[in-house]
Amino acid sequence: SFQCELVFAK
C-alpha cells in the first residue's frame, strides 16, 4: 500500500 497505511495500520 502506501505510507498512511503503515502509520495508521487499521
UniProtKB/Swiss-Prot annotation:
Predominant subcellular localization, coarse grouping: plastid
GO cellular component: chloroplast stroma
GO molecular function list: ATP binding
Coiled-coil residue windows: none
Domain of life per record: Eukaryota
Factors inducing expression: By water stress.
Location(s) in or outside the cell: Plastid, Chloroplast stroma
Alphabetized UniProt keyword annotations: ATP-binding, Chloroplast, Nucleotide-binding, Plastid, Stress response
Function as written in the Swiss-Prot or TrEMBL entry: Activation of RuBisCO (ribulose-1,5-bisphosphate carboxylase/oxygenase; EC 4.1.1.39) involves the ATP-dependent carboxylation of the epsilon-amino group of lysine leading to a carbamate structure.
Family note: Belongs to the RuBisCO activase family.
UniProt protein name: Ribulose bisphosphate carboxylase/oxygenase activase, chloroplastic
Species, as recorded: Pinus pinaster (Maritime pine)
